[in-house]
A protein has these predicted regions:
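N-terminal signal peptide c-region/cleavage motif recognized by signal peptidases
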Residues: 14-16
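Short glycine/proline- and aromatic-enriched beta-strand/turn motifs that initiate or cap beta-hairpins
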Residues: 20-113, 275-277, 281-283
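Residues that define the transmembrane beta-barrel architecture of outer-membrane proteins
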Residues: 44-46, 88-92, 143-147, 161, ...
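Residues on the lipid-exposed face of transmembrane beta-strands in outer-membrane beta-barrel proteins
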Residues: 50, 94-98, 108, 149-153, ...
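Transmembrane beta-barrel strands of outer-membrane/channel proteins
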Residues: 50-56, 108-112, 165-171, 202, ...
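Extracellular/periplasm-exposed beta-strand and loop segments of Gram-negative cell-envelope proteins
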Residues: 58-89, 112-145, 171-192, 221-224, ...
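Repeated loop/turn-to-beta-strand initiation elements of outer-membrane beta-barrel proteins
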Residues: 103-106, 159-161, 208-212, 241-247
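Outer-membrane beta-barrel transmembrane domain signature
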Residues: 170-243, 254-257, 284
């Protein structure tokens, strides 16, 4: 009769062994099978995105005479209307992401926009130290480069939601030039500076295939006689075609505003690029 209680105890211990192994890997019992992570933007260790970007561009530009007296300014120009620069672009954009351990991410992106125009001036234009007369044919160009490095740490991370912030660094370069070939007059100004930004990164996995993500970088500063702000925002809805390939549609906007008074290159510029994006993303 004592055989049955012993058999019952053995069966009970056998049923409890997998649970014990799950809680205590050193117990010697077999470990439960490891569950592989489901592919998603939250579990990707690396990705490269190639996007087609069609932004509308709005540019306000003013270049004042060097060392001018107070109250003396150049002519404020709408670059698209007054100088004939294109108001819409068709661009390719590349972005990389490297995940550093579980919560850290480094995003690398690059954007450039070179525009030129050739148009007769409707009014007299004071551009730096030169004055271009109405009716003259003016050649102008604005070249823009932005290379960004953004590190974020996810202070909240789950299977469905990830939110992080950190520090960004953008290397910006701009060059603007204007010329009237008939009068052999020309004026050019350029600037290149690194700027730190405050980023915010957000990802929401709606389902196993759909996800929404957004990230933004922002900075505003005033140093001596110069002041400016920079904003870079991107959002997208992603469809995961297979574990390593996704397609997405989204919206991107970049804004730059800079004003400087006095010195050799005083003036102001404000640019905005905003429009839809479609992209393909390879990840693992």
């Amino acid at each position: 009769m004592r055989f049955w209680p012993v058999l019952a105890a053995v069966l009970l211990v056998a049923r409890m062994t997998p649970a014990l192994a799950d809680r205590d890997p050193q117990s010697g019992a077999p470990l439960p099978p490891h569950q592989a992570e489901k592919p998603s933007p939250i579990t990707d260790r690396f990705y490269v995105s190639v996007a087609f970007y069609a932004p509308a561009v709005h540019t306000s530009l003013r270049l004042d005479p060097s060392y001018a007296a107070p109250g003396v300014f150049g002519t404020t120009l709408d670059a698209e209307r007054d100088l004939g620069l294109p108001g819409r672009l068709d661009q390719g954009v590349v972005e990389f992401m490297f995940r550093m351990r579980t919560r850290g991410k480094l995003r690398v992106d690059y954007f450039e926009a070179d525009r030129s125009g050739n148009q007769a001036l409707a009014n007299n234009v004071v551009f730096g130290n030169d004055t271009f007369l109405a009716g003259q044919m003016a050649q102008s160009s604005i070249d823009w480069r932005a290379f960004g490095l953004t590190y974020t740490y996810s202070f909240y991370r789950s299977d469905r939601l990830e939110i992080g912030t950190g520090l960004g660094l953008y290397f910006l370069q701009a060059q603007a030039s204007g010329a009237v070939p008939a009068e052999s007059e020309s004026q050019s100004v350029s600037a290149a500076d690194p700027i730190p930004t405050l980023p915010l990164d957000f990802t929401w996995c709606i389902s196993s295939r759909f996800a929404f993500s957004a990230h933004a970088n922002y900075v505003e500063a005033r140093i001596d006689a110069a002041s400016g702000s920079f904003t870079d925002v991107h959002s997208e809805l992603q469809y995961r075609w297979n574990p390593n390939f996704s397609i997405a549609a989204g919206w991107s906007e970049m804004r730059i505003a800079l004003e400087r008074s006095g010195g050799s290159t005083p003036g102001a510029v404000a640019m905005r690029f905003s429009g839809p994006q479609v992209l393909a993303r390879f990840s693992f």
